Amino acid sequence: MKLSTIFTVFAATIATVAGYETTGSKQTVDILIDYVIKETPELSQNDVANWENGDTVTLQYVVNNNEETEITVVGVTGQFKNPINNEIVTNLTTGKVGPIAVPPGEAIKFDQKINVDLIPANYELIPHVFIAQDSLIKVIPCRGQLATIVDAAVSFFDPRLIFLELVLLVTFAGLLYVGYEIWGKQYFKSVAPVKAKKTSTKASSPVASASTSAATGYDTNWIPESHLKQKKTKKVN
């Protein structure tokens, strides 16, 4: 069968399979498919993966062809299900693979990247692999993987958070300045203590000088002292 025909059938199969569930009678195939999570290869089927929104999870598949004829891996997809009621929460985007031919008795590996972006909760991930064999496209489900998804913790030094903090700080400072200009100045003026004026002791000098000038009829400050003494002597005689 030509590869172009396989791809045509593969596209038609994806379009007609609702929720990536196979229709019609189930067939038994001797094809073993398993995977490991590259980021946490120690996790098994009985473990619970812990992922954060924004993570990228890489599934590395191993496909063993125990059939008597050659098979071809042409695509991969999957589902996140509710582990309690088994309802489908979301379908993964269908990805094209290869095509990768797998002769009888051999095995191949390939990767699938999954971007985690779900409401924080518990899920079961169930991948599906599309296999072309004998002019047919077969959808083979893989084992499920339980996972707990949470939102990523926001770091205090996150650039987006720092920018938000700066915006809030500038806004708060601006509001304080406007409030001071409108109400603050008037308030501080009204409550500020009034300073008492100090009486200068030098103020008596001009008064005394003026009194002397008025009594003599002229300003005596410029008259030599010897002349004044002579005048006083004459008055006594």
Curated annotation (Swiss-Prot):
Localization, UniProt: Endoplasmic reticulum membrane
Superkingdom of the source species: Eukaryota
Keywords: Endoplasmic reticulum, Membrane, Signal, Transmembrane, Transmembrane helix
Membrane topology listed for this record: Single-pass type I membrane protein
Keyword Signal: yes
Classification via InterPro entries: TRAP_alpha (IPR005595)
Protein name per its UniProtKB record: Increased recombination centers protein 22
Pfam family, one: TRAP_alpha
Residue intervals on the Extracellular side: 20-161
Regions of this protein lying in the Cytoplasmic compartment: 183-237
Key word Signal present: yes
Cleaved signal peptide residues: 1-19
Homology family: Belongs to the IRC22 family.
